[in-house]
Curated annotation (Swiss-Prot):
UniProt keyword rRNA-binding present: no
Keyword Lipid metabolism: yes
SUPFAM superfamilies in alphabetical order: Trimeric LpxA-like enzymes (SSF51161)
Keyword field: Acyltransferase, Lipid A biosynthesis, Lipid biosynthesis, Lipid metabolism, Repeat, Transferase
Organism lineage: Bacteria, Pseudomonadati, Bacteroidota, Bacteroidia, Bacteroidales
Protein's name according to its UniProt entry: UDP-3-O-acylglucosamine N-acyltransferase
Highest taxon in the source lineage: Bacteria
Active-site feature positions: 240
Similarity-based family: Belongs to the transferase hexapeptide repeat family. LpxD subfamily.
InterPro entries for the chain: Hexapep, LpxD, Trimer_LpxA-like_sf, UDP_GlcNAc_AcTrfase_non-rep
GO molecular function: N-acyltransferase activity
Enzyme class (EC, first level): transferase
């Protein structure tokens, strides 16, 4: 499928600088641009590539001013990255979609399947489960008994939704993710640890995306809730009875212990760890590998273990580099003080 600069500009409400009849049929990174490809520039670090790229069309921010000749046709927009996302979504939507239930899939007789659903070979849909319209379920994905999957969802290969859990509309579950496994609940006894049955569920609201091999545990009682618009990277662990606020994003290997409430629009870097039974406010940013032992107020931007403000963290990091020299200096000072004490006592 081919589109002209004029058509693209109309769709994303952009201003054309160059040939409005330039056409593209594919996407490419700006440093790997080829004729017939559309690319984008949003990070200033990549600016040099715009003068040498072979891409036919490049999306740029409105404030971009070329310092030399640019051969590509430019389309100026408010946000080049956001406009690229719109085009990529349009591109995905234009792809032909399969529908129907493959004869090698297992679908329970009591399951309810919506319109234009595709269920791939070896997928499994349990008793009384529900699958909404236009949802795609890839090979070896499993929807447990009584679980409900909304409309326009994608369950990639080997993803698992346990019994009775709820997945909203427009959700994406990547390969190997597990929704609704038992929470890590055990009661200590003199004979060992006794398992506490986890009788709750997991609720994913609309527009949630869950990365590959990410696990969201079912509640002991009630529900573990992932609110609308949350995006979880690969290998994230959400424990039982957690609640994640709308539009919060978490990078790989974040781990959140049980019964913690995370606010809206938070951003957690990779390997952030948060203790249980805490409350994290709205719009909290945590740098990579931060360890959180206590509550955090809204609007905080922290990093480290325990987490501290960025300026304080960078100051501490500078001091940390000097610790070996400071230790030697401290030993020498102690030695000098002892020598002075001995002289004074004579």
């Amino acid at each position: 499928m081919e589109f002209s600069a004029k058509q693209i500009a109309a769709f994303i409400q952009g201003e054309i600088i160059g040939d409005e009849n330039a056409t593209v049929h594919t996407f490419a990174k700006i440093e790997e641009g080829i004729p017939g490809a559309i690319s984008f520039l949003s990070n200033p670090k990549y600016t040099p590539y715009i003068y040498e790229t072979k891409a036919s069309i490049v999306l740029v921010n409105k404030d971009f001013t070329p310092e030399q000749e640019v051969k590509a046709t430019l389309i100026k927009v408010d946000n080049a990255y956001e406009s690229l996302a719109k085009l990529l979504n349009l591109y995905e939507m234009s792809k032909p979609k399969r529908t129907g239930i493959d004869e090698r899939a297992y679908v329970a007789e009591t399951a309810k399947i919506g319109k234009d659903v595709y269920i791939a070979p070896f997928a499994c849909i349990g008793d009384h489960a529900e699958v909404g319209d236009n949802t795609v379920i890839h090979p070896h994905a499993t929807v447990g008994g009584g679980a409900k999957i909304g409309s326009n969802c994608i369950l990639y290969a080997n993803s698992t939704v346990y019994h009775d859990c709820r997945v909203g509309n427009n959700c994406i579950l990547h390969a190997g993710c597990v929704i609704g496994a038992d929470g890590f609940g055990f009661a200590p006894t003199p004979q060992g640890y006794e398992k506490i049955p986890q009788i709750g569920i997991v609720i994913l609201e609309d527009n949630v995306e869950v990365g590959a091999n990410t696990c969201i545990d079912r509640a002991t009682m009630g529900a573990t809730v992932i609110h609308s618009g949350v995006k979880l990277d690969n290998l994230v662990q959400i424990a039982h009875n957690d609640e994640i606020g709308s539009h919060t994003v978490m990078a790989a290997q974040v781990g959140i212990a049980g019964s913690t409430k995370v606010g809206e629009w938070c951003m957690f870097g990779g390997q952030v760890g948060i203790a249980g039974h805490l409350k994290i406010g709205n719009q909290v940013n945590l740098g990579a590998q931060s360890g959180v032992p206590g509550n955090i107020k809204s609007g905080s931007q922290l990093i480290g273990t325990p987490p501290m403000e960025l300026k304080q963290f960078f100051k501490a990091s500078i001091v940390q580099k000097s610790l070996p020299e400071m230790q030697i200096e401290l030993r020498n000072l102690r030695k000098e003080i002892e020598e002075l004490k001995q002289q004074l006592n004579k």
